[in-house]
């Protein structure tokens, strides 16, 4: 049996989980999310504890058991606490600011880079060098953070660019030259 799949999920207060056809709907104080439930799996909700159960031991069902439980856990945490990713900007003259709902960045190009946040994502800028991406959908928060980082990924010589706050940039030595 899948070790991740058989683990129970304790629901926080004000969070509801119900199965509708091929989806699991999760409602909470921050919003509503749904994740697909694969054939051969079912959701059992008892007294605020959710368990995923398999109807058979097919290899595909066993493989999807842990995945579905992890996706469901991400939805539960998202609607109760939310997800966030922090980015940092390094480099002389590099900065970010909010203009309406858009994120406007000066990243050393001849033009400003404008990023429009998708629905359900909130972007905050602190001190012009720190960007915080928040939302209830873990996948979407990570994708938005990756899109922003891709506008100017950190380079390996001085580390200039946009990086995740917890990311370590391995630096290279520059040219040594003749002596």
UniProtKB/Swiss-Prot annotation:
Xref: SUPFAM superfamilies: Ribosomal protein L6
Top-level taxonomic group: Bacteria
GO molecular function: rRNA binding; structural constituent of ribosome
Keywords: Ribonucleoprotein, Ribosomal protein, RNA-binding, rRNA-binding
Gene Ontology CC entries for this record: cytosolic large ribosomal subunit
Gene Ontology biological-process entries: cytoplasmic translation
Functional summary from the UniProt entry: This protein binds to the 23S rRNA, and is important in its secondary structure. It is located near the subunit interface in the base of the L7/L12 stalk, and near the tRNA binding site of the peptidyltransferase center.
Assigned protein family: Belongs to the universal ribosomal protein uL6 family.
Subunit comment: Part of the 50S ribosomal subunit.
PANTHER family in the cross-refs: 60S/50S RIBOSOMAL PROTEIN L6/L9, LARGE RIBOSOMAL SUBUNIT PROTEIN UL6M
Name of the protein in question: Large ribosomal subunit protein uL6
């Amino acid at each position: 049996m899948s070790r991740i799949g058989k683990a129970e999920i304790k629901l926080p207060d004000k969070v509801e989980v119900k199965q509708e056809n091929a989806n699991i709907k999760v409602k909470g104080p921050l919003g509503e999310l749904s994740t697909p439930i694969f054939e051969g799996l079912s959701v059992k909700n008892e007294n605020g504890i959710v368990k995923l159960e398999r109807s058979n031991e097919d290899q595909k069902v066993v493989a999807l058991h842990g995945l579905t439980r992890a996706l469901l856990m991400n939805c539960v945490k998202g609607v109760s606490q939310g997800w966030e990713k922090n980015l940092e900007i390094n480099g002389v003259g590099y900065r970010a600011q909010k203009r309406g709902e858009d994120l406007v960045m000066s990243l050393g190009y001849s033009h400003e880079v404008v990023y429009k946040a998708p629905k359900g994502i909130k972007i905050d800028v602190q001190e012009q060098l720190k960007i915080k991406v928040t939302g209830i959908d873990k996948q979407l928060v990570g994708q938005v953070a990756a899109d922003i980082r891709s506008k100017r990924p950190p380079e390996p010589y001085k580390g200039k660019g946009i990086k995740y706050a917890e990311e370590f940039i391995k630096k290279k030595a520059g040219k040594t030259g003749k002596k």
